[in-house]
Amino acid sequence: MSFGSKVSRALRFLEIPVKDRASVSFLKNPDLQPIKSANQTWGFWSNFAYWGVMSFSVGTWMSASSALGVGLSYPETIGTFIVGDVLTIIFTLANSCPGYDWKVGFTLAQRFVFGIYGSAFGIIIRILMSIVNYGSNAWVGGLCINMILDSWSHHYLHLPNTLSSKVAMTTKELIGFIIFHVLTAFCYLMKPYHMNYILIWSCVATFFSMLGMVIYLAKQAHGVGELFTSTKSTATGSTKAWAWVYMISYWFGSVSPGSTNQSDYSRFGSSNWAIWAGTICALLIPTTLIPVFGVIGASTCDKLYGEQYWMPMDIFNHWLTTNYSAGARAGAFFCGLSFVLSQMSYTISNCGFASGMDLAGLLPKYVDIKRGALFAACVSWACLPWNFYNSSSTFLTVMSSFGVVMTPIISVMICDNFLIRKRQYSITNAFILKGEYYFTKGVNWRAIVAWVCGMTPGLPGIAWEVNNDYFHNTGIVNFFYGDSFFSFLISFFVYWGLCLLFPFKITVKHDDKDYYGAFTDEEARKKGMVPYSEISEEEIRAYTLGEGYTTGHEYRPEGSDDEIPELVKTSSENTNEFEIVHHKNNEKQSSTASEKAA
């Protein structure tokens, strides 16, 4: 057997297995197709929990600790978080539309806007973000694992470190990190849309654990401490105004990856109301409440123990090391269990499954969500996440500023959805190489240019954030502070303007039939589509399995006499006009349609 034959055989072996009515190809696998209507089960609490799990977390508990660094008081910082939440809600809900309109995820939404090949830009960025965030969250999850193990054994609590001093972690931390990874890996055996109950229960458990901690500390300290009143704003005038802008932008930037791929989870929604109400409540209530818990925790610890503990794990470590009582051990165990569940839920939904969905979009023939998630889990070790927390690494600073890169992507997607395509997309064409979304050589250069224009001005600000001594330019720094606002507007209007100046042909507004069973009969008819239940088996196979492929835009079962639209551009260059010529029994009928770019 030749080397080429061996490679081909190995590649065939690596192809993902598929069931009936499913196929894999260069552009398609079952995980990329629209979600079946039967699996769109996420109601209010599921959507609330998806965003709530980000807030009922150790990271959000610690978030207010960044306040003093920019010169704001803690109450002012909570105010910036609330404004940042409103901004996040607007961006997130606007970016939810491809998911709840057409039941597709981030990968297909990228193809709609950036093109079949151009979509790789945003997808790769999201994958890198997911992998790094996976490592970071897994490390914190490992610390939560150690809370449980510490409560079990006094010897484990004082386990000696056997690692070299050159490694920025201890033996205990390594053990917790490994255990967390192993536990998380088993969860990828489930489908993403089955995870909603885990998300809900993790939010409930973590909320009551955090509430119990705050009540206990406040009772012991006879109040909430003095941090809310003793810390004063050191910034004044325009400096204070820009500090507000920075914290708002920072707060949005920390969750911008989730806003970017919101379609991955909005497609699971049972109704638009459930998505909107759940997302709004989750991005307003816990994101405000949990940072307040964190301030109370640090304030009461300062009064009780003479030190501000911002990480819940540090609080329990103090309790266990000073008094290894049954009460302290029980508290560490149950709170540690809820924190582990919270970190697992967040890591799986926002990092593991997210990267799995994205990798499935890059290599759909060989990668499904499960394989992609496991790959991200393995590669996350290469990020050396222990250096993020146990050394002087500036990587977390850079990561918190990554909204500079993500916000322009969100902006272009929103502009295309509302102003250019008017919320109309053809799902079948997202699986065709030279179809509706091929644009220019597979790339929508207008979207790429708009993304670059919105991203580039903020890059010097990231360099300044890493090292303030690089340069001293107030304009660049202030632009970076407000990047979430400025980059969004720049990319939005640049893309809109380019589409007006250089319009592309919108030849297919949406599919005429629900080939994937993504809608109920009533929903399909409202969208002007033939319901799935009324489509023949042969036609479904033609579209979902790729049998009978006949043209660059449509599928047809072989030997069928059904009408096949052949799309022919008209002479107009300034509008998106096209002529649809229907062929049936060698007879032609013509019709003309015109769609403007904006």
Swiss-Prot record:
InterPro entries given in the database record: NCS1, Pur-cyt_permease, Uracil/uridine/allantoin_perm
Residue(s) carrying Phosphoserine: 560
Cytoplasmic side: 1-41, 95-111, 195-197, 262-274, 354-371, 416-446, 505-598
Cited Gene3D superfamilies: Hydantoin permease
Membrane topology: Multi-pass membrane protein
Region (Disordered): 574-598
Chain coiled-coil ranges: none
Segments crossing the lipid bilayer: 42-62, 74-94, 112-132, 174-194, 198-218, 241-261, 275-295, 333-353, 372-392, 395-415, 447-467, 484-504
A GO biological process held by the record: 5-amino-1-ribofuranosylimidazole-4-carboxamide transmembrane transport
Compartments reported by the entry: Membrane
Single Gene Ontology MF annotation: 5-amino-1-ribofuranosylimidazole-4-carboxamide transmembrane transporter activity
Cellular-component GO terms for this entry: cell periphery; plasma membrane
Keywords for the protein's UniProt record, in alphabetical order: Membrane, Phosphoprotein, Transmembrane, Transmembrane helix, Transport
NCBIfam families: ncs1 (TIGR00800)
PANTHER family the UniProt entry points to: NCS1 FAMILY PURINE/PYRIMIDINE TRANSPORTER, NICOTINAMIDE RIBOSIDE TRANSPORTER 1-RELATED
Job description of the protein: Responsible for intake of thiamine.
Protein name as it appears in the record: Thiamine transporter
Lineage: Eukaryota, Fungi, Dikarya, Ascomycota, Saccharomycotina
Gene of this entry: THI7
